[in-house]
Regions:
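N-terminal, positively charged/glycine-rich alpha-helical extensions of SAM-dependent methyltransferases
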Residues: 1-22
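Conserved alpha-helix/loop element of class I SAM-dependent methyltransferases that forms part
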Residues: 15-23, 29-50
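Class I SAM-dependent methyltransferase SAM/SAH-binding core
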Residues: 53-55, 64-111
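A short acidic, Gly/Pro-enriched loop at the edge of an enzyme's catalytic core
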Residues: 110-121
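A short glycine-rich, Lys/Arg-flanked "PGG" loop and its adjoining helix->strand segment in the class I
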Residues: 135-150
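Short, glycine-/aromatic-enriched active-site segment of Class I SAM-dependent methyltransferases
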Residues: 157-179
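Short alpha-helix
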Residues: 180-196, 202
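Conserved Class I S-adenosyl-L-methionine
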Residues: 201-262
């Protein structure tokens, strides 16, 4: 999905491939500002010191990793399952003059190609919902982050049970958006604990992230003509429909989590 859709998506949404954070719960700031703000909200939940090495799980095209490196003066290794994303992220690091500090590789979060305790901290910015086995990915993170190291996660959740036609919407999000691990905050916390992590904070920021759904649908509708040639009419319309329906579902939520390796 990301091999084919990253470029068209980034063209209309911006290269931060994640939801925005609007403090007021209404879209009173541009998308680019709100997506940077979401990165900053996650940054605020990361404990890492200058010179330390942080793993970025599901790095997209590298924008959050570069912000992390610049803000905290850390080294970052980003991984993604998408080779074109890794190539773009590496080019961005090069352009930013940070290619020694920030590197990107192809890799699968559920089977990390790193030794035990290789990192001081890790974050996953809107990537763990893609995991077919979230506990397995979290166990891998626990393994590669040293004892005492920090983990920060931003991700989609459902704030309650879903009934009737809304179940089809969630199914469409799973199928079309690759959202394989979708559940409540309690499910997330249970998965973190099952992976052996100490949970520090689980904050429901559904209200602050929700304008993203409206904005996403709006941008995709407005830019439909630019998206169709690369993504295809069927895919674009399916995406718009799913976003509009999710926007009508009060259970469509978002969480910020922080944890520590014991
Ligand atoms: C919604 S994007 C977020 C990208 C980036 N964190 C950002 O905020 O700009 C999800 C990312 O997760 C990556 N991803 C999906 N499944 C993965 C897996 N099994 N292992 C590693 N990365 C994965 C995708 O390639 C993509 O980069």
């Amino acid at each position: 999905m990301y091999d084919d859709h990253t470029d068209p998506f980034a063209r209309v949404w911006g290269a931060n491939l994640h939801f925005g954070y609007w403090e007021s719960g209404v879209a009173d700031a541009p998308i680019a500002e709100a997506t940077e703000r979401m990165t900053d909200e996650l940054l605020a939940r990361m404990s890492c010191s200058p010179g330390e090495h942080v793993l970025d799980v599901g790095c997209g095209v590298g924008v959050p990793a570069l912000r992390l490196a610049r803000t905290r003066h850390v080294r970052v290794t980003g991984i993604s399952t998408s080779a074109p994303q890794v190539a773009q992220a590496s080019a961005r690091a090069e352009e930013a003059g940070l290619s020694d500090e920030v590197v990107f590789h192809c890799g699968d979060a559920m089977e990390l190609d790193f030794t035990d305790d290789a990192f001081d901290a890790a974050w996953a910015l809107e990537s763990l919902h893609h995991m077919s086995d979230r506990v397995r990915a979290l166990r891998e993170l626990r393994r590669v982050v040293r004892p005492g190291g920090s983990l920060a996660v931003a991700d989609f959740i459902l704030t309650g049970p879903v009934h009737g036609p809304d179940r089809h919407t969630v199914e469409a999000f799973r199928e079309g958006g690759g959202a394989h691990s979708l559940g409540t905050i309690e499910d997330y916390v249970a998965d973190l604990r099952q992976a052996g992590l100490d949970v520090i904070e689980a904050l429901d920021v559904s209200t602050q992230a929700r304008p993203s759904l409206t904005k996403h649908a709006e941008v995709f509708r407005d830019e439909r003509h630019r998206l169709v040639p690369t993504m295809g009419e069927r895919e674009v319309d399916r995406m718009i429909r799913t976003l509009e329906r999710l926007d009508e579902m009060p259970q469509a939520g978002y969480v910020l989590l922080s944890a520590q390796v014991p």
